[in-house]
């Protein structure tokens, strides 16, 4: 993946404040999926990458600055993800550009990001007043973080996942301890990860050990969640599986990949760290 060094993440960048769609940079999904032995035509999951951008501003027709929150939903079936720093630079390019309306801004973002991702996407813009009423994600299910264990493995170990013997059940596990690293800058990424499943009971202690083993693992947010989905399917074989990552923001943007073989994307509710 040496080509990633040539993306905006891999080099210093100038900040442009006039609308410039060419700043957007695609990253092929197939690169990481090859390592997981996934074929685009037969993915074992569906879902979306939900992006929240908190630093969007443009000028109205009178030259007055307008600010808004931006939500983007990029289906996991698109051939590309959007390199996150390039999206930040692209959104910054709206700052001193005049637009007729909020919908004109929304339409421009939807068109440009869809072209970069290689498929249809959805964009929503919200005023700060509208955003203020959005609920925060509520903890539901079993949080594994308070299990008292000794830890030795901080390198990727999918074999740590274990299933209890017994009848099929439906459960939800979550952890706020997920940490991984950007494959370009090696900066740490932090997330809450939620797993919902129907199948043999996943051992909460083993799930916690597995989450901790990703602590020094490299991958973009989307790749980490797909890796977790594949590992859980391989090690535990649940009939239904959902993996949802809520990553903390960087550069005014948070990315929240959702992968499932049975559910549609959950509501876009920020966690306490977002």
Swiss-Prot record:
Gene3D superfamilies: 3.30.1130.10. GO terms for cellular component: cytoplasm. The keyword Oxidoreductase applies. This is NADPH-dependent 7-cyano-7-deazaguanine reductase. NADPH binds at residues 84-85, 250-251. Keywords: Cytoplasm, NADP, Oxidoreductase, Queuosine biosynthesis. Belongs to the GTP cyclohydrolase I family. QueF type 2 subfamily. Its EC number is 1.7.1.13. It is an enzyme of class 1 (oxidoreductase). One of its GO terms (biological process) is tRNA modification. It comes from Alcanivorax borkumensis (strain ATCC 700651 / DSM 11573 / NCIMB 13689 / SK2). It holds the Pfam family QueF_N. The gene is queF.
């Amino acid at each position: 993946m040496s080509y990633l060094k040539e993306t905006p993440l891999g080099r210093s960048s100038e900040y442009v404040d006039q609308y410039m769609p060419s700043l957007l940079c695609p990253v092929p999904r197939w690169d990481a999926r090859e390592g997981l032995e996934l074929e685009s035509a037969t993915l074992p999951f569906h879902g979306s990458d939900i992006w929240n951008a908190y630093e969007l501003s443009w000028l109205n027709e009178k030259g007055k600055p307008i600010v808004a929150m931006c939500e983007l939903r990029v289906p996991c079936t698109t051939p590309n993800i959007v390199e996150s720093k390039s999206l930040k630079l692209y959104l910054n390019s709206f700052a001193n550009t005049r637009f007729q309306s909020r919908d004109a801004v929304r339409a421009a973002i939807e068109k440009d990001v869809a072209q970069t991702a290689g498929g249809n996407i959805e964009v929503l813009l919200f005023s700060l007043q509208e955003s203020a009423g959005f609920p925060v994600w509520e903890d539901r299910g079993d949080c594994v973080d308070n299990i008292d264990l000794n830890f030795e493995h901080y390198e990727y170990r999918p074999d740590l996942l274990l299933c209890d013997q017994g009848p099929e059940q439906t459960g939800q596990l979550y952890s706020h301890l997920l940490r991984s690293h950007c494959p370009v800058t090696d900066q740490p990424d932090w997330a809450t990860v939620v797993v919902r499943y129907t199948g043999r009971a996943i051992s909460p202690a083993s799930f916690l050990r597995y989450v901790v083993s990703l602590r020094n693992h490299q991958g973009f947010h989307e790749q980490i969640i797909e890796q977790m989905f594949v590992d859980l399917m391989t090690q535990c074989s649940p009939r239904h599986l959902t993996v949802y990552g809520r990553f903390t923001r960087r550069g005014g943007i948070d990315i929240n990949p959702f992968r499932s073989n049975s559910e549609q994307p959950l509501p876009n509710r920020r966690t306490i760290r977002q």
